[in-house]
Amino acid sequence: VISHCRVNYRPLVAADKPGLVLDIAALSENDLAFYCLDVTRAGHNGVLAALLLRALFNGLLQEQLAHQNQRLPELGALLKQVNHLLRQANLPGQFPLLVGYYHRELKNLILVSEGLNATLNTGEHQVQISNGVPLGTLGNAYLNQLSQRCDAWQCQIWGTGGRLRLMLSAE
């Protein structure tokens, strides 16, 4: 249970071939953020990018939320910042990434894909999310963003590094 939401995930690949890194963190008692990174497309730099994301992502997101009047984050601005930091860290490569933010009280899910495929199922709707261009490919981040109101959802995410299913229901 994270931020009063029941969260489950299931890797849908062999355990000896890890490739998708999933990180989920509570930002407050009402909201959480997550990302899924495919570490297989950039050699050893994929693992380094995962460590860099782990160290920076939640802090950048919390800083952004603290400095804006609106309740929902600007994931596009955040991903541009992450793309810039990957370049500053001199980490060449492609970093397919899906980023998500969920606010329990607003029942609002935001998903942004930069190179990973995803299908979102809310029970009422099933939406295919365009995979877009992986981070690190271009000098800027180009976004495929989806915003959906829901109190429960499943997201199947896949790329070169494998496939996983992430499920959430608000309590």
Name each region found by the language model.
Residues 146-149, 166-170:
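Activation on terminal intrinsically disordered regulatory regions flanking enzyme cores
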Residues 1-152, 156:
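… and, occasionally, acidic/histidine-rich disordered N-termini of signaling adaptors
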Residues 159-167:
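Short acidic/polar inter-strand loop motif in beta-rich domains
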